[in-house]
Amino acid sequence: VHCSGARKKGREEMWIAVQGCAHGELEAIYDAIEETNKRHREQFGQEGIALLICCGDFQSIRNAGADFESISCPRKYRQLGSFHKYYSGEKLAPLPTIFIGGNHEASSHLFEVRHGGWVAPNIYFLGHAGVVWFGGLRIGGMSGIYKRFDYHTGRYEAPPFQGDAVRSVYHQRYLDVFRLSLMAKEKFDVFLSHDWPKGVTAYGDEADLLRKKKHFRDDVRTGQLGSPPCEELLRRLQPRYWFSAHLHCKFAAIVPHGPPVPPENPTGEQKVTKFLALDKVLPNRHFLQFLDVEVHEEEVKRTGGGVEGRHFSYDPKWLAVLKATHS
């Protein structure tokens, strides 16, 4: 668990938590957040964390029946986890939570909300691809991982998932990338992917990464590590932050996007994306990060500001994209 420190004064900011692979460990994640909330209230007197973002392998498993059968995972590794407690109402998620899908999901559940929707009170799935607002932050994301042989196929899978469909259902598709690329003129604050963007390791401490993960070396050398569609979206959308998971390690990078184009950026500062990948939930692992993110003041004013204005809302421009590309 890592924190970005005390908040800066004079700016409208939101305190958020970012999680790598959740693997069904919701109780442990929420407990870690509450512990950090308590510590920061005592130290800084600031309000609590407003939002939890999960970067895939969320495992919204409701039962040990159909949901178990739809997970691409050896049977000996299947665990019910704690999500079912939040689904049944036994527990309530203590803060708004948004997530994307990974490659180990209860696909039978996520298929029901594949365009985005609530999987439990206060827990929102962004869908195969999606864009929403939350309290002055525009958040976009794309679920799944890249596999070349499925990229240009349609989404033909439907429950009950059998055979290859158990895996292909979570593979990234060209249609989702095309739809998201139509939002390139909009300003993205946060973008989520389970798979890392291809080539992102070149913009961080790649040598340190390869010391810790020696088996990455060949894939990095041959350009096979990461998702080419995510790399394309990183270049097109240029979000302020990009969060990922999947590879079970922490890695940070700052990706430049070329010189500024006046008058859009009169300060002369080069536009960059701050990339962060996080680990899975295990003791002494870097699975959770807390940070302050500056929000759009005009959007905060539109939603009423304060805690009351911090709720999920549709992005009208994304809805227009979906309408224009639906057939």
Where in this protein do the model-derived segments appear?
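Extended recognition/assembly regions associated with phosphoester-bond processing machinery
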Residues: 2-327
